């Protein structure tokens, strides 16, 4: 997704393409927010018989903006579901704006689940960390959950794993 203007949010990343013969395409990254804008959401990974596509990362927030959410990983049938995208970091001076949540991992009924994306970090001083993404449902093994993002130095909670 494209970067936002001064007060605008970043654009949403495009979805990864699906395939019935291989691995799904990766989702596009979300654009970075303008000075007061939030980061855009990452696009979801595409469906693939032999592996789900990875979700796109969320864009970073502008100086005062929140981070964008990571895209979810694509679903797979035979192999592993796609990993969720990482959440974008919040802007340095964002008051109460959190890092973006990590995307959830893709599922696979005959393979392993994809890992959840890590949460974005809160603003350098004041923001809370974003939550880590949920691991995907799998037949062989479930996907690992993503780690939560770090909080700002002065105020803010760490993100949940």
Where are these regions (language model features)?
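Long, compositionally biased tandem-repeat segments
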Residues: 1-161
